[in-house]
From Swiss-Prot:
Alphabetized PANTHER family for the sequence: 30S RIBOSOMAL PROTEIN S16, SMALL RIBOSOMAL SUBUNIT PROTEIN BS16M
Gene field: rpsP
NCBIfam families per the UniProt record, alphabetical: S16
Signal peptide: none
Protein name according to UniProt: Small ribosomal subunit protein bS16
Organism whose genome encodes this protein: Rickettsia prowazekii (strain Madrid E)
Coiled coil residues, start to end: none
């Protein structure tokens, strides 16, 4: 069973709130999950300490068992001071290189 560390959306319309969960990779985004390991509230100021709350010990455990974080969650994990496995870091770098950057509307009008 492939396991992911990802965000599950909650909250009301136009007021998002996310749980950082450990879930089966094939499960729906907001569906069943194995464990809740944190929260993310994008409505709070970026310097607020409660914007991202993570259980570091449980995340380290799941990373050790082979769970793969999504790109956004991997950024949260790195900011929290948890080291990601080399394999996960390498995959993130490859994805970043392959990502196509579209020019903004201003850049396309100027050309």
């Amino acid at each position: 069973m492939a396991v992911k560390i990802r965000l599950a959306r909650g909250g009301a319309k136009k007021r998002p709130f996310y749980r950082v969960v450990i879930a089966n990779a094939t499960a729906p985004r907001d569906g069943d999950f194995l464990e809740k390991v944190g929260t993310y509230n994008p409505m709070l100021a970026s310097d607020n300490s409660e914007r991202v709350i993570l259980k570091k010990d449980r995340i380290e455990y799941w990373l050790g068992t082979g769970a793969k974080p999504t790109e956004r969650v991997a950024k949260f994990i790195e900011k929290a001071g948890v080291t990601l496995p080399k394999k996960v870091k390498k995959e993130m770098e490859v994805k970043a290189k392959n990502r196509k950057v579209r020019p903004s509307k201003k850049q396309s009008k100027e050309s």
